[in-house]
Design a protein with these regions (language model features):
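Short amphipathic, positively biased membrane-proximal segments
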Residues: 1-61, 65-66, 91, 182-188, ...
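Beta-strand/loop substructures that line and gate deep hydrophobic ligand-binding cavities in soluble
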Residues: 159-216, 228
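Conserved aromatic-histidine-acidic binding/catalytic patches
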Residues: 68, 72, 212-216, 220
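Compositionally biased, intrinsically disordered linkers/stalks adjacent to structured regions
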Residues: 215-218, 222-244
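Hydrophobic-ligand binding "helix-grip"
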Residues: 18-19, 34-45, 121-185
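Hydrophobic ligand-binding cavity/cleft-lining segments
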Residues: 34-131
Length: 244
């Protein structure tokens, strides 16, 4: 019969201290983020010169929160935008974990419906509307919703009704997929999300929601960038090979 190895209590205590310290640090960082997001709500950063989007401005010139991302892609704008529209966001385990975490926090149920794989088709199946499309350049999508609800409904509106929508109790969200040319065979992919509440009550609810849960929303936007770049550049390389 083997001899049982004595437990190293000092190592165990040290490990627990590190775990506790790590959890405390994570909580402190998150708390600081929530406080910052709360204080900055309603003071969204205005776009830099290269970020200005007159197409998006048609539908939401004023907004209370904004998230912008961009990435250079070695592929023409048309290929980049197509890759963005067709990417399968749901195949990412991290994205799935974020959706499940949100449902758990708000007391909702994960959406187990069978959804289309392409990003544009997915958003439309959820209720989003294409407000404007410029082929090979930009898509502007929009919806109105109550994002703080456990299982929110995304309500699409006709383009001509979106900008003027002011029904109390809602948040209007506009989101773009955009590819700007950057030389003869490259592009800058851009994604921008804007949101504004329609009244004081919705603003109070959305401010709390955004302050606490926007890290997951922002992370989803950023997680799509590298897979998009890889797929667009793969398509561009395949097209160049086919031409030679």
């Amino acid at each position: 019969m083997g001899t049982r190895r004595p437990c190293d209590h000092s190592a165990l205590r040290s490990g627990l201290r590190w775990l506790t310290a790590g959890a405390g640090l994570a909580a402190a960082v998150y708390g600081a983020y929530v406080g910052t997001a709360w204080s900055r709500y309603g003071r969204a950063r205005r776009p830099a010169t290269d970020e200005v989007d007159p197409l998006l401005d048609r539908f939401m010139p004023e907004y209370e929160v904004v998230e912008r991302n961009h990435l250079r892609v070695a592929a023409p704008p048309g290929i980049t935008l197509a890759a963005a529209s067709e990417m399968n966001l749901l195949e990412s385990r991290m994205v799935g974990a974020i959706f499940r975490g949100r449902a758990l926090i708000l007391g909702g149920r994960p959406d187990d419906s069978t959804r289309p794989h392409g990003l544009l088709a997915l958003m439309q199946s959820l209720g989003w509307t294409v407000l404007l499309e410029v082929p090979d350049h930009e898509l502007v999508l929009g919806c109105v919703t109550k994002p703080w609800e456990p299982s929110p409904t995304f309500r699409g509106l006709p383009p001509e009704a979106f900008a003027a929508f002011a029904e109390p109790g809602y948040v209007k969200i506009a989101w773009t997929l955009r590819a700007d040319p950057d030389g003869p065979a490259a592009s800058i992919f851009r994604s921008e999300t804007r949101a504004i509440a329609t009244d004081r009550s919705a603003r109070a609810r959305f401010r709390l929601y955004w302050s606490c849960l926007s890290p997951g929303i922002i992370l989803i936007r950023r997680l799509m960038l590298e897979p998009l770049k890889a797929e667009a550049e793969r398509r561009a390389a395949a097209m160049n090979t086919a031409r030679t």
